[in-house]
């Protein structure tokens, strides 16, 4: 398939031939949901820990005798029913990692990119270079594309673009080798350079 390559004057400059497997696949909602959830789960620390009644310090002595006080019977002051007691079904550290194999991950990424193209939320530009790390220069370039919140995907690390975008609200920059499914799903619009498209195609092939 062919993608239109835009210049920053919003005119169609040329076209870029890309693989259907990477940018023209069908949208697999179930797979995308699974991969996004697995990615988010992998970012969880899993360090939450609470104490059960046996782990809370104290509570060894019976608070009062079994009968004759008129109060409900109690065997320990560390019961989950009591203030400062243990927690019933206390949370323990655990690993939230979900297994996603490489084929599933690549298929989900291709599915997301293809859907973004169909919805016209992905714009390919010939290049994005800044002479200096100036926010004004980057803002003027993006303004020509008439986009709102945007994720910029570039090939490699561009110091000028990274510095220029740091204090721009709604603008984030990512390298094509490290872009993740959550960033793609969350983005309102995506600007990709031609070099980044080729890198994504290599990555998903």
Curated annotation (Swiss-Prot):
Gene3D superfamilies: 3.40.1370.10. GO terms for molecular function: rRNA binding; structural constituent of ribosome. Residues 44-79 are annotated as: Disordered. GO terms for biological process: translation. It comes from the Bacteria. One of its GO terms (cellular component) is ribosome. Keywords: Ribonucleoprotein, Ribosomal protein, RNA-binding, rRNA-binding. Part of the 50S ribosomal subunit. One of the primary rRNA binding proteins, this protein initially binds near the 5'-end of the 23S rRNA. It is important during the early stages of 50S assembly. It makes multiple contacts with different domains of the 23S rRNA in the assembled 50S subunit and ribosome. Forms part of the polypeptide exit tunnel. HAMAP family: Ribosomal_uL4_B (MF_01328_B). Belongs to the universal ribosomal protein uL4 family. This is Large ribosomal subunit protein uL4.
């Amino acid at each position: 398939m062919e993608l239109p390559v835009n210049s920053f004057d919003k005119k169609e400059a040329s076209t870029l031939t890309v693989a259907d497997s990477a940018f023209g696949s069908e949208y697999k909602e179930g797979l995308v949901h699974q991969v996004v959830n697995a990615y988010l789960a992998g970012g969880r620390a899993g360090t939450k820990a609470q104490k059960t009644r046996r782990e809370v310090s104290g509570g060894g002595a019976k608070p009062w005798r079994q009968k004759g006080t008129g109060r409900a019977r109690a065997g320990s002051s560390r019961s989950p029913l009591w203030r400062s007691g243990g927690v019933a079904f206390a949370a323990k550290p655990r690993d939230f990692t979900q297994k996603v194999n490489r084929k599933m991950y690549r298929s989900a990424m291709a599915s997301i990119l293809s859907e973004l193209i169909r919805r016209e939320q992905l714009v390919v530009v010939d290049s994005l270079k800044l002479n200096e790390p100036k926010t004004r220069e980057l803002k003027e370039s993006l303004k020509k594309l008439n986009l709102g919140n945007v994720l910029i995907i570039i090939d490699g690390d561009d110091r000028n673009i990274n510095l220029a975008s740091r204090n721009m609200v709604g603008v984030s920059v990512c390298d094509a080798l490290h872009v993740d499914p959550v960033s793609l799903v969350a983005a309102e619009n995506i600007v990709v350079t031609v070099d980044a498209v080729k890198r994504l195609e290599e990555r998903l092939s």
